[in-house]
């Protein structure tokens, strides 16, 4: 059995600070090669995600890593000890990126040839897995592996002229097969994960399967509680599928540093491991790496790598049904408020620091994220916007718990172990003065502000969460939030950007 990595470095642009080796405010181009190397060598991460989704990507990454850092990669074998995993665009959803999907898969045999030259005959393929975002059906997964086999590998035997075949021109194509990792990003797909993962296993019978569960996008689209509980539901179903099909399943979880996006920070590693039992691989995003002291980051990653994976969560069918109902109920109260704040969120998002040279992801070229009836920025900008206006997104929707039954509340507290811990972190940054400024600057309806205050009241009075803290950093963040909003009100956007960046540094993440 191959090694399954415990940590995966990603290129998510959630870092408030820029690492010292990067020139400029955004990480791009050659610096992403340096970043991948440092993830392995400095931080001890076991896998790097190479992201071709929604951004320009260097398809020569393996060539550059092996040629620029030969000593390191001779001792740590790519594809055996450490791993590089492509995240490809989903051609079904991202129409403008279809050819990028094909281009990325076509580089896999090139990486094999490079490894053969570097390591010798029959090397471990340096790239043999791809992550498929927005997976909603088993057919999408099968299409990826069949595209690789039929279009790329089988083209070896295509006759060109007389006795000349494709393989005579470009050489034999290896590896012969690739593995696909479904990335499940929406609540409904998590709640019917059997029809995606189960059906795929039934048809393809893989020796094992890695399944990637998102935390950020479900939180943005359905609210914090719905996201956490959907993941717990999916983990329970995966545990049962392992037994049904006799195939080992290794779940990955896409987590950021702030509670809304997973609360996987160097300070909270222990809690995250306990919260998400059965997860094999956690994403180490940019804020984790660059907004904390290096020694803290390195020791946290070492801890995760060295911790044994606990048994997967397995719920009774009754509990699964209750959780499914809770996620739908919670979403309704959450989405109504987000729809009312969408215009503000989108405007404030434009003022946040840019940390990656991403291509446009709103409009024609790429995608934005839709919640209910509105379009929102990507999850990091969404979270950053709400923290900026003094309404941490973790709080939004909480008052809907007052309408839950005792059975439903028990399901929430039993299955979201660190709910209060996560809410307490976020509640430090609530800014009451900002609620009034929302009405003054953007004419937000008084009923919406009242509904958000109800969420805050529920957190304080029913859950015992302290709103606001007296420590220096919490008070500084609240003050900066007020200054940022006053700057926007006066049209002083450059000043607002300065305050917004300072706030991100205080909370150690953009969003």
Curated annotation (Swiss-Prot):
Pfam families: PEPcase_2
Cofactor, free-text remark: Mg(2+) cannot be replaced by Mn(2+).
Enzyme class name: lyase
Stored InterPro entries: PEP_COase_arc-type, Pyrv/PenolPyrv_kinase-like_dom
The keyword Magnesium belongs to this UniProt entry's keyword annotation: yes
Function: Catalyzes the irreversible beta-carboxylation of phosphoenolpyruvate (PEP) to form oxaloacetate (OAA), a four-carbon dicarboxylic acid source for the tricarboxylic acid cycle.
Record protein name field: Phosphoenolpyruvate carboxylase
Annotated source species: Sulfolobus acidocaldarius (strain ATCC 33909 / DSM 639 / JCM 8929 / NBRC 15157 / NCIMB 11770)
């Amino acid at each position: 059995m191959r090694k399954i990595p415990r940590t995966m470095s990603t290129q998510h642009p959630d870092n408030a600070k820029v690492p010292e080796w990067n020139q400029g405010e955004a990480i791009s181009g050659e610096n992403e090669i340096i970043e991948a190397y440092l993830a392995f060598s400095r931080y001890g991460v076991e896998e790097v995600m190479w992201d071709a989704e929604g951004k320009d990507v260097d398809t020569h990454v393996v060539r550059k890593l092996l040629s620029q850092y030969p000593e390191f990669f001779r001792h740590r074998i790519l594809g055996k000890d450490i791993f590089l995993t492509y995240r490809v665009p989903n051609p079904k959803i991202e129409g403008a990126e279809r050819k990028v999907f094909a281009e990325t898969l076509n580089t896999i045999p090139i990486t094999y040839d490079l490894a053969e030259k570097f390591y010798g005959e029959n090397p471990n393929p340096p790239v043999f897995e791809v992550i498929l975002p927005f997976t909603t059906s088993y057919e999408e997964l099968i299409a990826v592996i069949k595209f690789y086999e039929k279009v790329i590998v089988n083209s070896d035997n295509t006759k060109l002229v007389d006795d000349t075949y494709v393989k005579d021109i470009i050489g034999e194509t290896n590896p012969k097969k690739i593995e696909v990792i479904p990335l499940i990003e929406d609540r409904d797909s998590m709640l019917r994960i059997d029809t995606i993962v189960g059906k795929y296993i039934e048809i393809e019978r893989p020796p094992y399967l890695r399944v990637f569960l998102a935390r950020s996008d479900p939180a943005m689209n359905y609210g914090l509680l719905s996201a956490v509980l959907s993941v717990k539901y999916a983990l329970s179903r995966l545990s049962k599928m392992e037994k049904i099909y006799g195939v080992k399943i290794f779940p990955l979880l896409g987590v950021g540093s702030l509670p809304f996006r997973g609360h996987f920070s160097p300070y909270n590693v222990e809690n995250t491991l306990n919260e998400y039992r059965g997860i094999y691989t956690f994403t180490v995003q940019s804020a984790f790496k660059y907004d904390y002291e290096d020694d803290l980051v390195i020791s946290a990653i070492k801890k995760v790598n060295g911790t044994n994976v606990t048994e997967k969560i397995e719920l009774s069918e009754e509990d699964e049904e209750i959780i499914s109902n809770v996620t739908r109920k919670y979403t309704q109260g959450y989405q109504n408020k987000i729809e009312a704040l969408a215009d503000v969120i989108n405007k404030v998002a434009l003022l946040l620091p840019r940390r990656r040279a991403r291509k446009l992801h709103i409009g024609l070229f790429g995608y934005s994220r839709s919640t209910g009836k509105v379009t929102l920025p990507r999850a990091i900008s969404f979270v950053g916007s709400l923290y900026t206006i003094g309404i941490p997104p973790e709080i939004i929707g909480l008052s809907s718990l007052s309408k839950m039954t005792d059975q439903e509340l028990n399901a929430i507290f039993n299955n979201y172990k660190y709910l209060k811990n996560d809410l307490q972190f976020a509640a430090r940054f609530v800014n009451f003065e900002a609620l009034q400024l929302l009405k003054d600057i953007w004419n937000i309806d008084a009923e919406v502000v009242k509904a958000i205050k109800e969420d805050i009241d529920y957190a304080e009075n029913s859950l015992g969460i302290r709103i606001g803290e007296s420590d220096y950093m919490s008070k500084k963040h609240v003050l900066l939030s007020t200054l940022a909003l006053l700057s926007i009100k006066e049209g002083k956007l450059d000043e607002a950007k300065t305050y917004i960046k300072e706030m991100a540094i205080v909370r150690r993440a953009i969003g």
